Design a protein with these regions (language model features):
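Extended, subdomain-level signal for the structured scaffold at the beginning of enzyme domains
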Residues: 1-127, 140-258
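Glycine- and acidic-residue-rich phosphate-binding/metal-coordinating active-site segment common to enzymes
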Residues: 130-131
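Short, thiol/selenol-centered motifs that function as redox-active sites or metal-ligating centers
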Residues: 134-138
Length: 258
């Protein structure tokens, strides 16, 4: 397997820790060169709830953060490995073989409609390079429209994994905040409040892939049975339970490329 150069992109407003940690560790362990990029060029910090091993998802009524995963995320956050990401606007897709988007609720704020990130993805698509997106970062693909496809989404006609609508934090009196683990005065994320999740990924993806595409929204996905889709050039994953499978699938596909 030849070593590849992989650009890994993350939000500055709250990753779901494992959705960055797992693909980061897996792609590095496979021997590839990784470069981290964020919108602001600041360390990507995890949502505090994503490093809380006692957190019980109130919708699916299950714990989502294994203690050993929380420990590893904190090691990376407290250490230096993620200290100096480049800005999206300073990255050039010509320097990389693959672009990997990671998830977290913050992705809906600063990745989904980010012009600089969209340009990187367009440049990847135009040069036939692998593009990955996990959980809420799939929204970046939804909102990226292609003039060569009559302004349809770049995922039109594709098979794409989507966070199930039945898992969304949606209901009366939700007040969701984006508190970060490891926040500092110059990297504190946002104090925005949203009434649950910002938007329903499943519905957006169904619309974006169109009648000839497939939205795979598997509400039964779990750590034992994760959900990842591969439809060149896209690798997409459902949510945090599929983070490891997402990283492994990217490594698997990279191994097939010259």
């Amino acid at each position: 397997m030849s070593k590849k150069k992989v650009l890994i992109c993350a939000t500055n407003y709250g990753t779901w820790g494992e959705e960055l940690q797992a693909p980061w560790d897996i792609i590095k362990a496979a021997g590839h060169d990784v470069t981290l990029a964020t919108p602001l060029g600041k360390k990507p910090l995890p949502l505090a709830v994503s490093v809380d091993s006692d957190f019980l998802d109130p919708v699916i009524n299950a714990k989502t953060n294994p203690p050993e995963v929380c420990k590893r995320i904190k090691e990376l956050t407290d250490g230096t490995e993620w200290n100096k990401p480049i800005k999206f606007k300073d990255a050039k897709m010509s320097d990389y073989d693959c672009i990997v988007l990671t998830g977290g609720l913050g992705a809906m704020i600063d990745m989904a409609n980010n012009w600089n990130l969209h340009k990187l993805i367009v440049d990847a698509l135009r040069t036939n390079k692998l593009v990955g997106a996990l959980c809420y970062s799939v929204s970046t693909l939804v909102f990226l429209r292609d003039p060569q496809l009559d302004m349809k989404s770049v995922i039109y006609g594709k098979k794409i994994a989507a966070h199930p609508a039945s898992w969304d934090f949606y209901g009366p009196d939700w007040d969701f905040t984006y508190d970060l683990y490891g926040a500092t005065p110059d990297n504190k994320g946002t104090d925005v409040h949203t009434p649950g999740f910002l938007w329903p990924m499943e519905h957006l993806v169904r619309d974006a892939v169109g009648p000839n595409g497939t939205c795979v929204s598997n509400y039964k996905a779990n750590r034992a049975n994760p959900e990842v889709c591969f439809d060149w050039p896209f690798v997409t994953g459902t949510s945090v339970e599929s983070s490891i499978a997402y990283g492994k699938k990217i490594v698997e596909v990279l191994a097939t490329l010259k």
